[in-house]
Amino acid sequence: MPGNHWYDILKKIACEGSSDIDELKGIFEKELSKRKFDSIRNIEDLIDVLERADMLSLHNVEPLRKMSSHKPKLIEALDRYGTPVSAPREPVNIYQEERLAEELRQHLRISQAFQILSAPGVAPPAFIPAAAPTPPPPQQNYITPAAFTDRKRTAVFNKISEELGRFWRIFGRKAGIGEGTMDDIEERYPRDLKSRILHLLKLIEEDDCHDPRQLLMRLCRALTECGRNDIKRKVEQIMSH
């Protein structure tokens, strides 16, 4: 895995030479808020803004590649850097996992039984009882509206706001919150990360105010997609009690 040293070298190479900053800014115009876009005066500013928006990092240097069209030295350095870019994942309905796993286990049990009965030297029985139907998975009551009490809501929001940390923008983006809205939240709470995250959670809740189940699925999906499965499991644990 390339280290911070090589990542810093890439950024330094990107800043070398003369470039049309307006042309480079235009590449990211649709992805940045107007306030951030207008604050960019040079390549150093552009790189700083991209990093603050979690669009450029040690593990994702694709924005530098977009800026490299007239910089053969940067293209060569990026090719040597070799950071893989993860393909976007399909959204996963996490509440179907248990049911699908049980269906697979049942299928394997039936297949193994028929393999044994079909083996040489094994006499087939006069009657093979049909496999007992798989009972439906128990209802996950923790995602019903009645179970989403104020106490559990507070516990879920507190857990996410206490542990999400610097992932808050990626989480917000995965939950469908716009960059401009998150800029406003950051301006409102410049030094209070927990309040920033709580405000973000309330905005997400407002979108799903009549559907607690959808809200919880949206939160858990966003946690999964921003790489915080540890928090997702804690949220599910809170809701299961």
Curated annotation (Swiss-Prot):
All residue ranges annotated as the Death domain in the record: 151-237
Database matches in InterPro entries: DEATH-like_dom_sf, Death_dom
Gene Ontology CC terms, in alphabetical order: cytoplasm
Cystine pairs: none
Keywords, in A-Z order: Apoptosis, Cytoplasm
Gene Ontology BP annotations: apoptotic process; defense response to Gram-negative bacterium; signal transduction
UniProt-annotated location(s): Cytoplasm
The keyword Metal-binding is annotated on this UniProt entry: no
Gene3D superfamilies in the record: Death Domain, Fas (1.10.533.10)
Location of the region described as Death-inducing in the Swiss-Prot/TrEMBL record: 1-101
One protein family per Pfam: Death
Chief location of this protein within or outside the cell: cytoplasm
Function text: Component of the IMD signaling pathway and is required for the host defense against Gram-negative bacteria. Interacts with Dredd, promotes cleavage of Dredd and is necessary and sufficient for enhancing Dredd-induced apoptosis.
Subunit and partners: N-terminus interacts with Dredd. Interacts with imd.
Protein name: Fas-associated death domain protein
Source species taxonomy: Eukaryota, Metazoa, Ecdysozoa, Arthropoda, Hexapoda
Gene: Fadd
